């Protein structure tokens, strides 16, 4: 009996250690090879929430929304948000119905949609075509659809949204000021804000409550993606302002790993990092 009680206590303690979320984009190659084994590794690393980035042809990582939801439940992982880069005004209703069926709360537009996103391979820079006014109109329409589907719409930033465009407009500021918060809020990627030389806390103060999910990843001395806690971003000060920001969830993410580090190892380092920093 004493042994059983001890073991139960150990299991309970271990379960209590699970916290935080992981953006599955971090382990996208592993998910493509073996989703179940990869998700088990995510759970074993200590995460309890996930953000998907693998929707195609009505399925998440090759599974129906119901099957994906069931797999996550069996692994004690909670679906929180899903990145849907291929969303259009025509396919949004079906995508959102699938996201809802899979158990997600937030539908995230990760880049300017509908062909507006640009990437310059030569100098590795991102941007957008069209106008920010057009982007705002699209996001407003998507926000209305999300509300009807029982979801909340978020827009995820990179660095270019924090830089003035050819008309002198800072795109992220325009979206924050011109799209109804009942229809659109934001997923702040703390790495890309830092890369753009913007100040997350200044944005929290200017637009309180608008940043519902954070992407948490660090920056090494070369400016590259790094596991949380191993780089130069001052997460402690940012975390002190989480209530002001409106943050409900956060997702560890690392777009690429370097110097032989594998993504499934990087997520373990990052989980230790968020623990040391004080994320819960």
Language model features by range: what are they?
Residues 11-106, 112-113, 272-275, 279-280:
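N-terminal pre-domain/capping segments
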Residues 51, 81-83, 108, 154, ...:
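Conserved beta-strand positions in the central sheet of alpha/beta enzyme cores
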Residues 26-28, 54-56, 85-88, 113-115, ...:
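Active-site-proximal loop/turn and secondary-structure-junction residues that shape catalytic pockets
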Residues 1-10:
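Bacterial N-terminal signal peptides
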Residues 49, 89-185, 264:
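Active-site acidic/histidine proton-transfer and metal-coordination neighborhood
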Residues 16-26, 30-45, 172, 176-188, ...:
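Histidine-acidic metal/acid-base catalytic patches
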Residues 77, 104-105, 151, 244-248:
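A short helix->loop->beta-strand "cap" motif at the edges of active sites that frequently abuts
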């Amino acid at each position: 009996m004493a042994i059983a009680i001890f073991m139960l206590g150990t299991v309970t303690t271990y379960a209590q250690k699970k916290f935080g979320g992981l953006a599955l984009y971090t382990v996208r190659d592993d998910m493509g090879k073996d989703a179940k084994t990869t998700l088990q590794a995510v759970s074993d690393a200590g995460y309890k929430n996930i953000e998907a980035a693998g929707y195609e042809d009505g399925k998440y990582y090759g599974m129906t929304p119901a099957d994906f939801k069931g797999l996550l439940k069996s692994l004690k992982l909670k679906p929180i948000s899903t990145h849907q880069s291929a969303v259009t005004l025509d396919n949004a209703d079906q995508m959102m119905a699938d996201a809802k069926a899979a158990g997600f709360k937030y539908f995230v537009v990760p880049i300017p949609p509908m062909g507006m996103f640009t990437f310059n391979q030569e100098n590795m820079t991102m941007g957008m075509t069209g106008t920010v006014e057009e982007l705002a109109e699209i996001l407003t329409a998507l926000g209305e659809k999300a509300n009807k589907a029982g979801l909340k719409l978020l827009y995820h930033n990179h660095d270019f949204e924090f830089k003035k465009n050819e008309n002198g407009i800072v795109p992220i500021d325009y979206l924050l000021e011109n799209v109804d918060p009942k229809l659109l809020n934001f997923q702040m990627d703390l790495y890309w804000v830092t890369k753009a030389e913007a100040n997350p806390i200044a944005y929290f103060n200017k637009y309180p409550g608008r940043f519902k999910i954070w992407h948490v990843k660090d920056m090494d001395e070369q400016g590259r993606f790094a596991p949380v806690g191993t780089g130069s971003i001052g997460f402690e000060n940012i975390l002190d302002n989480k209530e002001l920001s409106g943050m409900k969830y956060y997702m560890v993410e690392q777009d690429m790993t370097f110097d032989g580090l594998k993504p499934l190892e990087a997520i373990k380092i990052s989980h230790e990092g968020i623990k040391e920093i004080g994320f819960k």
